[in-house]
Amino acid sequence: MKICVFDTETIDLEKCFVYNIGFCLFDTETAEIMLKEEYVIEQVWHNTALFETAYYANKKDYYSQCMRGRTIRLEKFGYVTQRMYRLFKEHEVTQAYAFNSPFDERVFAFNCEWFKCINPFDNIAVHDIRAYAVEYIGKTEEYKKACDENQWYTEKGNYGTTAEIFYRYIMNDKDFIESHTALDDSIIETAILLECIKRGAEYGQNYEVPKSLARTRTQMLEVYHNGEIVYERECNSIYKRQIKDTTKIYLKGE
């Protein structure tokens, strides 16, 4: 079976004009990437005011160098969608995967409507690699231990569930930094998906997508009466910054 793993880079999260698309065609029988392509979208690239609002506009020199070296092609959005559509048909692709796929699906839907182009994913089932990773990697005690050892936490103190952190873990590379370019990200996300398959996941599944991977911790519960401890025990609780390591309860009266 041939599947597509893809990624998009957009100017922002709301007006999601796409400026970079990368994808791999992956053979599930040989576990090898058989084709990979990357494009910068001409309509956004040449709109200087629009492109310079992009999250990663500082990568413009990088994209320029890649286009000069012909490792990335500058093409109109419609060309890219037609190219993907033809490749999917040629290789009988019926499944696609992306990390946090609802966002990338929204990107294609928005841009296809804006530019009046065919959506190559209209008849393709798209599955979320993040859901796979949380289910088969993130919920393991080994992964949580690695997060604790390396402080791989979110701003709210939960366990990290980004592609960057999952890739650090499976490759045992604590210094890995995600490039946030579409093809490179597609390649590392393919590796994450393959690791999940090795751990027992099945292609074509829609695993539950949690908003976060909650972190638990041991907390002391102490009950006081007339200034003395009358009960204490250890308990597990969901980590929250505002909760102290020890909870004290004071009983009134005799």
Spans of model-derived segments:
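Conserved non-catalytic scaffold segment of RNase H-like nuclease domains
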Residues: 2-111, 247, 252
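Short helix-capping/linker segments at secondary-structure and domain boundaries
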Residues: 31, 138-144, 196-204
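Active-site-proximal helix-loop-helix substrate-binding element of RNase H-like nuclease domains
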Residues: 46-65, 129-184
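Short, polar/flexible loop-turn hinges at active-site or ligand-entry regions and domain interfaces
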Residues: 66-71, 115-121, 173-179
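Substrate-recognition/cap helix-loop segment adjacent to the acidic, metal-dependent catalytic center
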Residues: 102-127
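Hydrophobic side chains within alpha-helical segments
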Residues: 107-108, 131, 188
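Acidic two-metal-ion nuclease catalytic site recognized across multiple nuclease folds
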Residues: 150-154, 169, 183-254
